[in-house]
Amino acid sequence: MSEALKERKEMDPQYQWDLTKMYASDAEWEKAFAAIDPKIEALAAWEGKLNNAASIREFYDAEIGVFRELENLAVYTSLRLSEDTRADDAQSMDARATAKYVKAVGTIAYAQPEILALPQETLDAIMDDEQVAPYRFALEDLLRAKPHTLTAPEEKLLAAFGEAFGTPKNVADNLEDADMVFDSVKDGEGNDVELTASNYILLQTSNDRALRKNAFESYYKSFRQHINTLAASYSGAVKTAAAEASVRHYESSRAMSMAGENVPGQVYDNLVATVRKHLPDMYRYVALRKRILGVDELHYYDVYAPLTKGVSAHYTYDQAKQMVLDAVAPLGEEYGTIVRKGFAERWIDVFPNKGKSGGAYSGGSYDSNPYIMCNFTGTLDSVSTIAHEMGHSMHSWFSRHTQPAQYADYTLFVAEVASTVNENLLIEHLLAEKNQDPATRLALLNQYLENFKGTVYRQTMFAEFERDAHAMAERGEALNPAALNNLYKKLIVDYFGPELVVDDEVQYEWARIPHFYRPFYVYKYATGYSTAVALSEGILKNGEPAVKKYLEFLHMGGSAYPLDELRHAGVDLTTPAPVDAALDKFGRILDEAEACVAQLEAAK
């Protein structure tokens, strides 16, 4: 069914990203790396002097310059490492770049506490001085964190542990990407099929149930064999977050995480409560799967299976590019031109190869073009992934070409909005095609339903897992394999309902979710998707006025708080309304899917 993966050097370079635009070679990177130390050390010159507007402006200008260079160094090595996680040179470069970044953070650890220790009248005078105008919002944000900022020596000490704090994630990443081996599996005809981290989800979307079952069991067999290590690494990450929250005088690690973006806890709680209110529609979707697949028992290895047999379209990469371009056409000529530029100038690393990181992401630095890492396999989901990651990249492109470096990075809270708008525009574009037979339309509706399931329901389930795991640690309870497995299994039962048989392997799934090592990130997928539903519907229904507000949002970067940016785009997430409306749409799509099934059944 699937070809054996090639080594990277055997792949066609035209389908690989072009990193020479960052550094012509690793040797050029080494030169830049060797030159950074004196610049980092020079940042210490302002210690004890940040008591007036002129000094603060000079310091921030210098800091931005150094960290732009550090970002280039770190992004390049991260991209190189993604190409082949087994490569010793890339591992070494990435570790060195991380260490240098940690050194720089430690060097400037004095700055925030020094500014925050100033008398209020001095701070007021500084804020009113036009010399700090380019950094006024950043300073306002800093002053908001005053109760949670430590003394200069304490901040420096905490910064020194920065690299060590990343160890739990590094352990899990290296174990899963480089060391874990998955046994090959048999398909329904007895053929051997290679199983990798990159193709696991693809195999779960096969019409071959035996292949799905065998891949599911083999995949989680490896996680079961390493579950003690994975539980220990995750426990370490949770305890690290809890310790920092305590030291910084937050009531919890969740409060610390959300405070960084000025998002109140009610947004998180509204999400969970609203999604739980709509769980009956998820149970209806699970029941529809069971009905269509015609199985006596629906297992977890059935939840990604196509709802229509014989409708398993395969797309070439060229077709995928055109589909994305057609889908984003409503966003205007400039948007489409830049997407074409990305395709033509090799922003994208397209196909899987041995050692390549699984999944997909958009990266890059302020001074580089965006880069997209994906593992394209020709499915509709793969096409959707390109649309998704290009949405991230376009958000970055507009932000970096509009905002100064200090405001170019948008927050994680809004990070999934642009990507999901693109996904929704793609699926709406495909659904708008005329004269679709019920089977083809059902396949598209299934993709839409899967997007909702994966991005709203599933990510909210993850958010509950994360909330409860962190709360357990904060109560002093052990996060051992049994505790984490039981917590996750209960949530699977709650979210998928009575029609799903919960196999033993399901309880290990939490261990494969890398986002758990970025505390309280996953809920933003769900809020982002709900926002994207509102925005994409507005773009398609209202045209230019909605497009204008949306593109303005993409240009804002991190120049305002995320909830304010979304209000500018027309969505208020401090109320349950956007999530409610999104899941009402899920119900309507499900109604149409059920109607397609009825048509197909009547035609038999």
Descriptions of predicted regions:
Residues M1-G310, C596-K604:
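A well-structured
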Residues L5, K9-M11, T20, A24, ...:
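C-terminal, non-catalytic "cap/extension" segments appended to globular domains
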Residues I292-A327, G336, H395, L449-T455, ...:
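Long, K/E/R/D-enriched contiguous segments that form extended
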Residues A313, D367-A387:
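Short pre-active-site segment immediately N-terminal to the catalytic Zn-binding motif
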Residues A313-Y315, I348-S368:
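Catalytic zinc-binding patch centered on the HExxH motif and its immediate surroundings
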Residues Y371-N375, T402-L412, R441-N451, H470-M472, ...:
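Short beta-alpha connecting loops at secondary-structure transitions
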Residues G391-A405:
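Catalytic Zn2+-binding segment of zinc metalloproteases
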Residues Y410-P438, Y448-E450, G454, G528:
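Post-HExxH zinc-binding segment in Zn-dependent metallohydrolases
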